[in-house]
Amino acid sequence: MKKMIKITLLAAVFGLVGLMNTETAKAAGAAETFKFYCAQCHGLEGKGKGPNVTKDFPVTPRDFSNAKEMSKLSDDYIRGIVMDGGPSQSKSPLMPPWGKTISEADVNGLIKHLRGICKCKGKAG
């Protein structure tokens, strides 16, 4: 009986470690997705100062580190812009639609990543 309890506890511990590794992998995946698709305009730190943004750039990309502004945006609003592009939300046509390029799970990871950058939650809805 004691052996069975030890085996069960050991399995539970390894299961939790596996879950933690999965969450870590998801976070790393979201950061890599951000770096690949977003950082060119928004910058690695999400401040809207990526390498593609020059003095001649016609718009200023959103500063994801601005908690006051980011907290006004719902996750659904952000999802819409990422999936369908800027014009879908009356924003810049320079923000491309990524919905046919990255998965919905990746978009959800990006939203969590953006919330981590701003250290804020979005408005409901």
Protein language model annotation of sequence segments:
Residues 8-18:
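Bacterial N-terminal signal peptides
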Residues 60-62, 81-108, 117, 122-125:
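Axial heme c-ligation environment in periplasmic c-type cytochrome domains
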Residues 47-77:
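Gly/Gly-Pro-rich "capping" loops immediately C-terminal to redox-active cysteine motifs
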Residues 29, 33-36, 73, 77, ...:
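Extracytoplasmic/secreted proteins, especially bacterial periplasmic and envelope-associated proteins
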